[in-house]
């Protein structure tokens, strides 16, 4: 009885538009890793790619949004630029944490790579030390 009632409630919510039809196909995955150390300006350093820790149930799942976070050992050096990239495109990150739809439409099972770049030439003192970085990928 409860199962039948639950099914009727869900069908009703779908039919009046309170729940989108693809609401049950949504999901998210989280991945994190230790960061990088960078001591030279003008050189882009890619961190180890992050990917879904388990195979996704849907092969055609697409990214809706991504939350990111990276932690630095000390203050960010002048000229620091950080991007989050798939194999086909990148989005610049504004600050150490946030939420973006900049990679929406990409395959949800794709690898994501943090790329760190410090504009200019010469050594960075103290070196940039990224303690860790994390992504939360929301997909549908």
From Swiss-Prot:
Signal peptide: 1-25
One GO process term, biological-process aspect: bacterial-type flagellum organization
Species per Swiss-Prot/TrEMBL record: Yersinia enterocolitica
InterPro entries: FlhE (IPR009420)
One Pfam assignment: FlhE
Purpose of the protein: Not essential for flagellar formation and function.
Protein name: Flagellar protein FlhE
Top-rank taxon: Bacteria
Keywords, sorted A to Z: Bacterial flagellum biogenesis, Signal
């Amino acid at each position: 009885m409860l199962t039948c009632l639950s099914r009727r409630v869900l069908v009703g919510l779908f039919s009046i538009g309170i729940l989108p039809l693809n609401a049950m196909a949504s999901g998210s995955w989280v991945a994190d890793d230790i960061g990088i150390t960078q001591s030279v300006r003008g050189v882009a350093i890619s961190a180890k790619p992050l990917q879904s820790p388990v195979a996704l149930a849907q092969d055609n799942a697409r990214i809706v949004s991504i939350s990111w976070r990276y932690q630095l050992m000390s203050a960010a050096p002048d000229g620091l630029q950080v991007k989050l990239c798939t194999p086909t495109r990148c989005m610049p990150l504004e600050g150490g944490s946030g939420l973006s739809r900049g990679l929406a439409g990409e395959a949800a099972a794709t690898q994501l790579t943090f790329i760190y770049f410090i504009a200019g030439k010469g050594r960075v003192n103290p070196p940039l030390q990224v303690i860790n970085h994390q992504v939360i990928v929301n997909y549908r």
